[in-house]
């Protein structure tokens, strides 16, 4: 059975307030976990394995399974993509700078891409064929479904920011950069580069 990852609300303040996090974490994220558990029961594999092996599930359940598995994984990736520790250089950041020319250029491209997202979904920094890419995926689509490895996730569903930012999604996107967890992203990068 899948369970929620731990989340310390203090690590995301003041960028996202407690009321917003409580709704997001305890209602939206929890609903995806509950739905996935009811669909796959005691399936003894990771959410990533469910996504990668969706063809092994009952054809009539696949659509619901992939939406809820994506919902669980994307939320976990999003929550793990943030903390309030100061930004530090690491191999991931060094390689981002090599590919994008500067950290500021990467940041600007990521923000520009996120601001172009229409409707609900996520902006991801992914690793694809050994290179970085910044992609927008709708709803609960997941990079693993497209043979990409997610490194950073920004949730652009309104429930992720609305209670804190109301309709100022651009400010939410900009503020996200003050709490990106590059240490977590680097750990994934080092395992998959």
Show which residues each predicted segment covers.
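Feature for soluble, non-membrane regions of globular proteins
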Residues: 1-193
């Amino acid at each position: 059975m899948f369970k929620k990852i731990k989340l310390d609300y203090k690590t995301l303040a003041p960028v996202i307030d407690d009321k917003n996090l409580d709704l997001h974490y305890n209602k939206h994220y929890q609903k995806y976990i509950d739905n996935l558990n009811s669909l796959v029961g005691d399936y003894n594999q990771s959410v990533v394995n469910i996504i990668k092996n969706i063809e092994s599930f009952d054809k009539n359940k696949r659509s619901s399974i992939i939406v809820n598995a994506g919902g669980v994984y994307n939320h976990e990736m999003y929550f793990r993509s943030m903390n309030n520790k100061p930004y530090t250089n690491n191999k991931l950041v060094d390689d981002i700078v090599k590919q994008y020319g500067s950290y500021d250029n990467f940041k600007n491209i990521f923000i520009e891409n996120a601001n172009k997202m229409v409707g609900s979904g996520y902006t991801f920094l992914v690793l694809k064929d050994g290179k970085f890419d910044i992609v927008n995926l709708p709803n609960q689509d997941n990079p693993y479904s497209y043979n990409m490895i997610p490194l950073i996730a920004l949730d652009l569903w309104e429930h992720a920011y609305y209670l804190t930012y109301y309709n100022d999604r651009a400010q939410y996107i900009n503020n996200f950069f003050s709490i990106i967890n590059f240490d977590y992203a680097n750990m994934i990068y080092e395992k998959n580069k």
